[in-house]
């Protein structure tokens, strides 16, 4: 996980959490209440070939936001917020009921401030929620970054359970991403070298097999982390650092997989996705395959004008202020890159 190497990046601790819901419809509950938000993807206008800030004032705020996941039916959204220079980080949740989205709140199993909860991922069939937490696996274990999973039964998420060996180890595991056949891709911290590498473990008869470290076309750059794999395993998006054609510190790269399990040379995903900003290390694709969501701390706001308490607070509490936000773009950007994949 990038925070293991990049947590020295300074993010401001917000003094005020302002979730001022931006209206996506003209209906309101009443004077002083939050606007009713309805429609797919929180009623946001779909992006084309240019990236857009996602859900300004609802999900993307002045805080640090990252790690977007949505269920296949489009009715549940998970994402992360952090504060206090990563002292506190947890998973937020919004659900659409009777056509109306709830205001994002902390997910019910991610409320203990003693632990971190991050990097949610929904399985392609929508029955499992994977995420990372520093919760101890049991009373005899020490707190450590492990992969946890909740199972959905009768419309309710179960309490999380530790995924266990062989995927989880005494070291640290990050950023789970699962294919249709249950294969899990994730980042593992090598306790000897101190480097992070992308691994995968196949699911056979309901049991995860011995993890496999992927080759150099996936484990690229001087550092890499937080890889997202397509549900059909046809491509993988890898945030990589130290690449010669990088726009900034860490950029999103993509590698495509052929029928013989070969991975193509990694390709920078271009200015449509990457920027000179350093905070770009969490990407995912919606379960309908239409949209790429990604984290970026690019600045999008102009000067706050004449500096005052009011203007600085407004700037501080607004998205695109230098803290990471969530953006989205059509996956046509991926298909264009696929055409020129080199193995």
Tell me what each language-model feature is.
Residues 1-7:
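N-terminal secretory signal peptides that target proteins for export/translocation
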Residues 7-14:
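Sec-dependent signal peptide recognition
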Residues 28-343:
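Short, conserved micro-motifs composed of acidic
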Residues 15-19:
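Short, linear, compositionally biased motifs with a strong N-terminal bias
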Residues 21-23:
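C-terminal motif of bacterial Sec signal peptides marking the signal peptidase cleavage site
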């Amino acid at each position: 996980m990038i925070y293991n190497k990049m947590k020295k990046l300074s993010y401001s601790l917000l003094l005020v959490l302002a979730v001022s819901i931006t209206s996506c419809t003209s209906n309101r509950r009443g004077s002083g209440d939050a606007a009713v938000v309805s429609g797919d993807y929180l009623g946001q206008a779909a992006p084309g070939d240019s990236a857009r800030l996602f859900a300004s004032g609802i999900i993307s705020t002045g805080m640090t936001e990252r790690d977007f996941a949505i269920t296949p039916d489009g009715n549940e959204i998970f994402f992360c917020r952090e504060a206090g220079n990563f002292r506190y980080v947890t998973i937020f949740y919004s659900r659409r009921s009777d056509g109306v989205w709830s205001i994002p709140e902390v997910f019910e199993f991610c409320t203990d401030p003693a632990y971190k909860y991050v990097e949610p991922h929904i399985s392609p069939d929508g029955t499992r929620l994977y995420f990372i937490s520093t919760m101890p696996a049991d009373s005899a274990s020490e707190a450590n970054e492990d992969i946890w999973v909740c199972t959905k039964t009768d419309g309710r998420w179960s309490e999380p359970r530790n995924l266990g060996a062989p995927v989880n180890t005494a070291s640290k595991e990050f950023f789970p991403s699962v294919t249709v056949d249950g294969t899990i891709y994730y980042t593992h911290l090598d306790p000897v070298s101190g480097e992070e590498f992308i691994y995968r473990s196949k699911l056979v008869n309901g049991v995860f097999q011995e993890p496999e470290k992927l080759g150099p076309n996936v484990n690229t750059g001087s550092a890499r982390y937080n890889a997202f794999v397509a549900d059909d395993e046809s491509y993988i998006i890898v945030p990589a650092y130290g690449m010669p054609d990088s726009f900034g510190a860490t950029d999103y790269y993509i590698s495509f997989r052929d029928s013989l399990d070969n991975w193509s040379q990694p390709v920078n995903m271009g200015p449509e996705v990457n920027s000179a900003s350093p905070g770009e290390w969490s990407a995912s694709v919606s379960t309908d395959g239409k949209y790429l969501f990604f984290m970026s701390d690019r600045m999008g706001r102009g000067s706050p004008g004449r500096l005052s308490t009011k203007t600085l607070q407004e700037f501080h509490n607004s998205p695109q202020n230098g803290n990471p936000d969530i953006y989205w773009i059509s996956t046509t950007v991926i298909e264009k890159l696929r055409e020129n994949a080199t193995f």
